[in-house]
From Swiss-Prot:
Protein's name according to its UniProt entry: NAD(+)--arginine ADP-ribosyltransferase
Site (Cleavage): 7-8, 633-634
Active site, UniProt feature: 481, 506, 590
Keywords: Glycosyltransferase, NAD, Nucleotidyltransferase, Transferase, Virion
PROSITE patterns to which the protein is assigned, alphabetical: TR_MART
Amino acid sequence: MMELITELFDEDTTLPITNLNPKKKIPQIFSVHVDDAIEQPGFRLCTYTSGGDTNRDLKMGDKMMHIVPFTLTAKGSIAKLKGLGPSPINYINSVFTVAMQTMRQYKIDACMLRILKSKTAGQARQIQVIADRLIRSRSGGRYVLLKELWDYDKKYAYILIHRKNVSLEDIPGVPEISTELFTKVESKVGDVYINKDTGAQVTKNEAIAASIAQENDKRSDQAVIVKVKISRRAIAQSQSLESSRFESELFQKYESTAANFNKPATAPLIPEAEEMKLGINSLASKTKAAKIIAEGTANELHYDYKFFSKSEVNEVSEKIKDVILNAIKNEPTTSIKCLEKYAAAVNQFFEEYKDNWLDKHNKTRKGQPDEVWGEITKNAWNAAKTKFLKRMIYSFSGIGAGPMIDITIARDGSKYTPSQKRGIREYCGSGYTDINNLLLGRYNPERYDVMSEKEIESAINNLDSAFENGDRIPEGITVYRAQSMTAPIYEALVKNKVFYFRNFVSTSLTPIIFGRFGITHAGIGLLEPEARNELTVDKNEEGITINPNEIRAYKENPEYVKVQIGWAIDGAHKVNVVYPGSLGIATEAEVILPRGLMVKVNKITDASNNDGTTSNNTKLIQAEVMTTEELTESVIYDGDCLMETGEVVAMTGDIEIEDRVDFASFVSSNVKQKVESSLGIIASCIDITNMPYKFVQG
């Protein structure tokens, strides 16, 4: 049976592996992407300094290495191993691929994996057999397994690899043969060992195996990860991967350099900064926007809804203008706060005409029972109000952002070099799909849109150069983009409260997520809770809704379910950006954020709605750019707390702690930001249906 298993095993089935501490000279803590679950197994490489639990990182010159499996939780913490995923054998294959590379590169003589048999899905022996085959086929005969250790312990499965031409007892870190277990007897054929309990003679390898197991049975996995260092960026990278991708050499090249572009801004403030701030903050621009919207709204309420006579249009228009202006007067017109206050005011205004609407609606009744008619009336009113609010927010999103579009049209992009301009034009034109697909691990050289790999490499290099040259937008500006995200990646985002963008991030200075490029279809998320609760359909802020007809497909493949996200991102002033102006499509008011960007999630709002067509799983996410200065790449955390409670606590005392952002704000499910309760209305106005793909790709 074992021979059959090894024949069926595919040696090339390795899984994606992420180095969770890229700062280490010797990579030694990894996550393994086994499936689309939000918790993934990982492993740490380490060594022991004595016969007890005292362990440390691998260093140059070490000869004995230990592999300790663990689970990487969705919160980014390390916990005791819960399982190896659906294919423990593929996990082991991936682990030993890394182990063999490490042993060869750093001249390590022995390596041991100890794993609880209860976590192997009944495949402990198969795992040992597979490891034996891997070592024999990949080491060129230089390494062998100590098979005498396989069946020593009922609780653990042991796998020990050692260099063939080195005696085990001579390797530093391998325990001496235990005098508690064995008596050494000299004989004519050499030393023999007698088991003190049974009196039976055993081979030297059997005595070594028993001594190794005796020492390691006392060790706890908990002690190994008490002082482990992990990278927030690497965790986010591993959790933002889709299961189907093409990890080419170029993908790996650019993945390894992405953090370079998430550093604090070095570019000078753009010349248009003051004009930009004035355009969205001046009373004149707000009055102009309020007047335009009020006139259009008054006419709509007269002609479409027949709420009042034509002679009252001007009076109603003035009233609407005053209501809007009073709501938004203290907020920048492109900010979420402004849109939120505007939405609340418009909602309240429309409610004043509910009796008028009901009078017209009740005239259409055709003898339905009161209970039935009441439900019909409720649904019809909600749909009518939803449709109205979405149109209103759509209008304000475009008109209030008018100054941003005018400024962008006038910008010439002359600060960039010819090659940088070429890269920007290629990205803003038709090349962004292939460029970002390569960075996302989706690019297939046999099926691409317009650019070959060589052309993409040139474009990315030119864009990277443009970011180094770069622009810096003023503080207090919110940029917007949309994204269609698979359910597993979204769930990791919710748990971890951080998201990693592998690709260049196309955003707009205008609130394009509320329908600027199409008919608004998701607009109720900015309302106060009571009003929003009436209009949303999911009734679920952060969770995912699985419709009955999707349950089977979701169980078979969680990536089947997509979540539509509207991003409102603050803090873009913290990093170098590219502001293309006339080098791109100026009416889009595009600002490109760098690849490798990390954002902290501050607020997730349910944006689902039904205005005649149901839109499930639509979310408004408010986030903030985090630079490498704010987000520590490697911090020491208390492993005891991580494993026992899931709480992330930085180590103190004699251990040097690097400057860092408070990680509790990333993992807490109760992250709160002071926002107006009307946020719900705006969220449901998110519309990404007809948006240019570069503002959605990710």
